[in-house]
Amino acid sequence: MTELQNYIDGYGFGISVKELASRAYSHMAAKGHKVCIVNDRYLEVDGTTYLFSKSRKHGRWIAKAI
């Protein structure tokens, strides 16, 4: 989801994955999406589960649909 990826692009590696998931949850819920936190690394948005991982190659967080 482009909206989720664009949101987390604003965060560097100084934030924990748990905090990132929490902030992404709040942002997406405020935008009117159906959201739930599966666990520290996973967020479900509108029925699709996303894994948050670090991309050292690109120097940013990645939200990958699984």
Q: Where are the regions that the model predicts?
A:
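N-terminal acidic leader/helix
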Residues: 2-30
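Hydrophobic transmembrane signal anchors and adjacent membrane-proximal interface regions, especially
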Residues: 6, 15, 35-38, 43, ...
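Acidic, low-complexity, intrinsically disordered interaction modules
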Residues: 21-56
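Intrinsically disordered, low-complexity regulatory segments enriched in Ser/Thr/Pro
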Residues: 53-66
